């Protein structure tokens, strides 16, 4: 399954990459990528654009964070969307409000716009978010393994 594949990739490359482990995968077995293709198709259906658009996967990555490791604020541009599959570990990412600073200038006392939020996640959860959204991963309490897929939505030529 995907967890065994991820552990094998990690064990084969962990001494060749800096910590925290983040590897771009160029050759992916079809059985690993197929579920993500289906999720991307369902995302297009949810948006109501499945008949006119296609999701083009532009990058695929594997991240392994060991206890007390973290990831600084980042975003995954220039892709349109980022899909994260939490294979193991329950430590969530923190997502930052893209216009918080601007809103604070206009109305500094407005508390309803939090600058950052995290989602409650379980192992196996998949989330999709716009790639312009900054996120980080605070120190994890135990090993966390995620697969990240970047994709663009393109109109199907008529």
Segments (PLM) and residue ranges:
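Non-heme Fe(II)/2-oxoglutarate
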Residues: 1-53, 68-70
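A short coil-to-beta-strand element that immediately follows conserved catalytic motifs
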Residues: 48-60, 95
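Residue-level preference for beta-strand/loop junctions
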Residues: 56, 77-79, 143
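Catalytic core of non-heme Fe(II) oxygenases with the double-stranded beta-helix
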Residues: 61-128, 138, 156
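A short hydrophobic beta-strand segment most commonly corresponding to one strand
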Residues: 83-84, 142-157
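Asparagine-centered strand-capping/turn motif at beta-strand->loop junctions
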Residues: 135, 139-141
């Amino acid at each position: 399954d995907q967890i065994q594949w991820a552990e094998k990739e990690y064990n084969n490359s962990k001494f060749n990459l800096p910590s925290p482990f983040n590897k771009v995968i160029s050759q992916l077995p079809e059985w690993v990528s197929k579920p993500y293709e289906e999720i991307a198709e369902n995302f297009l259906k949810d948006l109501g654009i499945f008949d006119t658009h296609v999701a083009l996967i532009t990058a695929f990555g594997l991240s392994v964070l060991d206890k007390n490791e973290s990831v600084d604020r980042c975003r995954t541009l220039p892709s349109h969307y980022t899909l994260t599959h939490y294979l193991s570990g329950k430590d969530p990412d923190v997502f930052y409000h893209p216009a918080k600073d601007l809103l604070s200038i206009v109305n500094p006392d407005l508390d309803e716009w939090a600058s950052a939020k995290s989602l409650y996640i379980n192992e196996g959860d998949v989330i999709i978010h716009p790639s312009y959204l900054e996120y980080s991963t605070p120190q994890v309490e135990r090993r966390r393994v995620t697969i990240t897929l970047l994709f663009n939505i393109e109109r199907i030529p008529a």
